[in-house]
Amino acid sequence: MIRKAFVMQVNADAHEEYQRRHNPIWPELEAVLKSHGAHHYAIYLDQERNLLFATVEIESEERWNAVASTDVCQRWWKHMRDVMPANPDNSPVSAELKEVFYLQ
């Protein structure tokens, strides 16, 4: 498994709405993530700084990257763009984080 972590932002007035939209996520989005090899996906909120910290284990970078081109992912990004900063393609503005420590 490949461990990934990344950070995103959420609008200051949208914390509750962001959480509501993820509980639960769309069943078809969950199915796409799982079918593309995503496991143990978690998102944490830093309320003071409006930051979202996400971790996920993936089976391959290629399969993970392919999620972005699915119809359901494109619809999800469009659905979420009003609660968080988004790129021109509606994907969330994000930055990948470098792992510096891991205890198994």
UniProtKB/Swiss-Prot annotation:
It comes from the Bacteria. Homodimer. GO terms for molecular function: L-rhamnose mutarotase activity; racemase and epimerase activity, acting on carbohydrates and derivatives. Pathway: Carbohydrate metabolism; L-rhamnose metabolism. It is found in: Cytoplasm. Keywords: Carbohydrate metabolism, Cytoplasm, Isomerase, Rhamnose metabolism. It catalyses: alpha-L-rhamnose = beta-L-rhamnose. The active site is at H22. One of its GO terms (biological process) is rhamnose catabolic process. Involved in the anomeric conversion of L-rhamnose. This is L-rhamnose mutarotase. Belongs to the rhamnose mutarotase family. HAMAP family: L_rham_rotase. It is an enzyme of class 5 (isomerase). Its EC number is 5.1.3.32. Substrate binds at Y18, Y41, W76, W77. GO terms for cellular component: cytoplasm. It comes from Salmonella typhimurium (strain LT2 / SGSC1412 / ATCC 700720).
